[in-house]
Amino acid sequence: MPGKATLFATLLACAALAGCADHKLSEQSLAKAQSEFDQVKEDSDVLRAAPKDVIRAGESLARAERLSSYWGSSSDVIQYAYLSQRYSEIARQHA
């Protein structure tokens, strides 16, 4: 029996560490998306050339932030943060 308890404790610890890694990655993704969005929303050339892409970047970022704060998984947060970054990049390319 002690072997099964030890195995269970080890598996539980691994799952907790994986969850921490996912959370850290989602926080990093959010921070990068926020930085990219801040740059494009402050650039008048980008706002003039690609307003819809800037709006989409902001909407995707807002969704990622909502998901991170209460009910989304880390993969959901990472996905919407990625979309926000891509829309920011697309907007910048149009300027």
Where do the PLM segments sit?
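Conserved anionic group-binding/transfer micro-motifs
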Residues: 3, 57, 84
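C-terminal motif of bacterial Sec signal peptides marking the signal peptidase cleavage site
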Residues: 16-19
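Bacterial N-terminal signal peptides that target proteins for export
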Residues: 1-8
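Short, flexible active-site loop motifs that bind/organize anionic cofactors or intermediates
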Residues: 10, 67
